[in-house]
């Protein structure tokens, strides 16, 4: 599988995380490996899926991998549109794939609710699919030896969630809840300013070395950034 995007460069975040910076309308994509299993956070629109998977394969990140869990932070098309293409490409490499997300988002994905997914804004039609792991606030997502905490953070959408990886390096995958110096839009279906404020206050209770947002660049001053962007 060849990479056809020379501008796409993997950004390594120690000890075992790779950031693929979203291009065009795609969300950022994150890859976290633990032994023969791995987590992928969000998949973009799908238009560049072959390039993203090709890069991961070409750089050796997929070598010896047996299983991948794809976690969607929320239901917008720029984060879930690549789900089935990622699945097909990974399964073509002999890797088992399952999908995980908050149970509110899972229902939207399984029903293919276009008015909430916003696929029409990209000139596309999302194909509904099964979600294998349906989560709620406080649940633990297990991937290899990794244990990630699910944090329900409504505001951008009702089902938006962050994933927290507590370890020597503490990571928070934020989706579109909070960016570097910005927050996600609240004027889309199921968005809420009041809920977002509550979610941001909730996130201040976590110690985070790197916030890994759905768009833009890494958040290094976690609590300072939350204070700056609080609406």
Where on the chain are the PLM-derived regions?
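Conserved beta-strand hairpin/beta-sheet module of binuclear metal-dependent hydrolase folds
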Residues: 6-58, 162-175
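Short, hinge-like loop/turn segments at secondary-structure boundaries
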Residues: 115-120, 190, 229-230
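Residues at the C-termini of beta-strands that transition into short coil/loop
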Residues: 21-23, 103, 136, 154, ...
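Active-site HxH/HxHxD metal-binding segment of metal-dependent hydrolases
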Residues: 47-50, 55-140
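Short, surface-exposed connector motifs at secondary-structure boundaries
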Residues: 35-38, 62-67, 144
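Metallo-beta-lactamase
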Residues: 2-8, 12-15, 38, 45-47, 103-154, 158-229, ...
């Amino acid at each position: 599988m060849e990479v056809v995007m020379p501008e796409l460069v993997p950004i390594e975040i120690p000890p075992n995380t790779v950031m693929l910076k979203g291009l065009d309308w795609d969300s950022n994509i994150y890859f976290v490996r633990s032994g023969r299993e791995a987590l992928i956070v969000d998949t973009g629109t799908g238009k560049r899926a072959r390039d993203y998977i090709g890069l991961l394969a070409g750089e050796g990140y997929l070598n010896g991998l047996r299983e991948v869990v794809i976690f969607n932070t929320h239901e917008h098309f720029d984060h879930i549109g690549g789900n089935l293409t990622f699945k097909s490409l990974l399964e073509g490499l002999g890797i088992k794939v399952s999908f995980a997300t908050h149970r509110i988002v899972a229902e939207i994905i399984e029903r293919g609710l276009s008015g909430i997914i916003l696929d029409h804004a990209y000139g596309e039609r999302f194909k509904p699919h099964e979600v294998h792991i349906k989560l709620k606030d406080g649940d633990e997502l297990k991937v290899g030896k990794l244990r990630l905490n699910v944090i329900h953070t409504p505001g951008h959408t009702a089902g938006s969630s962050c994933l927290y990886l507590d370890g020597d390096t503490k990571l928070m995958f934020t989706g579109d809840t909070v960016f570097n110096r910005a927050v996600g839009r609240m004027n889309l279906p199921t968005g809420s300013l009041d809920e977002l404020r509550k979610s941001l206050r909730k996130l201040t209770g976590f110690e985070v070395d790197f916030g890994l947002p759905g768009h833009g660049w890494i958040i290094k001053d976690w609590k300072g950034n939350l204070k700056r962007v609080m609406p």
